[in-house]
Design a protein with these regions (language model features):
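Membrane-interfacial loop-to-transmembrane alpha-helix junctions, especially the N-terminal start
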Residues: 1-9, 51-66, 116-124, 200-205
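Membrane-interface loop/short-helix elements at transmembrane-helix boundaries
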Residues: 161-164, 278-332
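A membrane-periplasm/extracellular boundary helix in multi-pass inner-membrane enzymes
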Residues: 139, 236-294, 314-315
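Interfacial juxtamembrane loops and adjacent helix segments
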Residues: 143-164, 328-335
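Membrane-embedded alpha-helical segments of multi-pass membrane proteins
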Residues: 28-46, 91-100, 176-184, 226-233
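N-terminal signal-anchor transmembrane segment
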Residues: 1-50, 71-77
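Alpha-helical transmembrane segments of multi-pass inner-membrane proteins
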Residues: 118-149, 170-220, 224-241
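Aromatic-anchored transmembrane helix interface
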Residues: 62-68, 81-109, 119-123, 128
């Protein structure tokens, strides 16, 4: 029981890092920033014990890249004589994410004795499925929505204005990008991790999570479709099913996948016909598919907006080479 509670606590830490939010009583500080400060403390403490603070070559390369990116943005702003330094301080954001990530890995290592990609993927999968469930509960039950909105500050007024699903820290494109990453990680585990491939219950759990995140995640943010398509492509390429031959090692995977696919399709059709909440959200999630079936055009309102007001290309050679030095305040009408 104590181990289960510890795993739930780590899941909360992972969620606070991956989907940061603020509490209404102190909206200036979000969970990612709090974890980053904790991470700095842990790094200093660990450094004092070991008498050194070391970085891997891969991490050092990422740190250098962050500083180079910030410097380029500074040059662009200075050269164009603007006072827009939105991305000049990117390295601060980088170290904030890095500090929070250290806490997550530290917590996982404390409980499991190691911090591996498979363990991290397991926690991220649980967190993403939980966020999807929370989003449905918030959308369907006003009392629960009021409870969340009372204690959590995450700009929910805008989400409600545009009628978008949201969880606790999970909303709009940032959530879609993070859902996409987890879908890819799940596909990787299903194809490459022998412990997962040999355990029927693990295959079933990860496939169920894949379907839940793919469907409800798209209801929250259609950017999730990117991860869905890449995840499917990874499954197809890694298992070799495009050759119309299923290898013995992947037979369990595809047998469970086929059963779940049929189940989710039947359930989806039933809810589409009988549940107005599901009807509205599923049509938003897969608007491109419904438009293609009903009108023959593969388009969405989002892609129309991208093509008209959001894809802004440089108008001269200087803009292509050094940029305009303008990033923030939607100067290019990106909303």
């Amino acid at each position: 029981m104590a181990r289960v509670l510890a795993m739930l606590f780590i899941s909360m830490v992972v969620s606070g890092y991956y989907f940061p939010f603020s509490f209404a009583v102190f909206p200036q500080l979000n969970t990612k920033m709090a974890l980053a400060m904790t991470g700095v403390f842990l790094v200093v403490l660990q450094g004092c014990r070991r008498h050194k603070i070391s970085f891997s070559k891969e991490l050092l390369g990422a740190i250098i890249f962050a500083f180079v990116f910030s410097f380029i943005c500074f040059i662009a702003a200075d050269y164009n004589h603007t006072d827009d330094y939105s991305y000049v301080t990117y390295f601060i954001s980088f170290f904030t994410w890095l500090g929070g990530a250290f806490v997550v890995c530290f917590a996982i290592r404390m409980l499991h004795g190691k911090a591996t990609l498979s363990l991290l993927t397991g926690y991220l999968t649980f967190v993403c499925v939980s966020q999807c469930i929370l989003a449905i509960l918030i959308d369907r039950f006003p009392a629960f929505q009021l409870l969340v909105d009372t204690y959590v500050s995450q700009g929910q007024e805008f989400f409600q204005e545009v009628r978008r699903l949201y969880g606790i820290g999970a909303a709009l494109d940032p959530a879609g990008v993070r859902f996409s990453i987890v879908l890819l990680l799940i596909a990787y585990l299903l194809c490459e991790n022998e412990d997962v491939k040999q355990a029927k219950w693990k295959v079933s759990v990860y496939l169920f999570a894949f379907f839940v995140i793919a469907v409800i995640g798209n209801m929250i943010s259609r950017t999730t479709s990117v991860g869905l398509l890449l995840g499917i492509a990874y499954l197809i390429c890694s298992t070799g099913i495009f050759r119309l031959i299923i290898r013995r090692s992947y037979f369990r995977l595809y047998s469970i996948l086929g059963g779940m696919l049929i189940t989710f399709i039947i359930l989806g059709v039933y809810l589409y016909e009988h549940d107005p909440f599901f009807y509205r959200n599923i049509r938003f999630a897969f608007e491109a598919f419904f438009n293609w079936v009903e009108t023959g055009e593969l388009r969405t309102d989002s892609t129309d907006k991208l093509n008209t007001v959001m894809w802004i290309w440089p108008e001269n050679l200087k803009g292509w080479l050094i940029g305009t030095g303008l990033f923030a305040n939607f100067v290019y009408s990106t909303v």
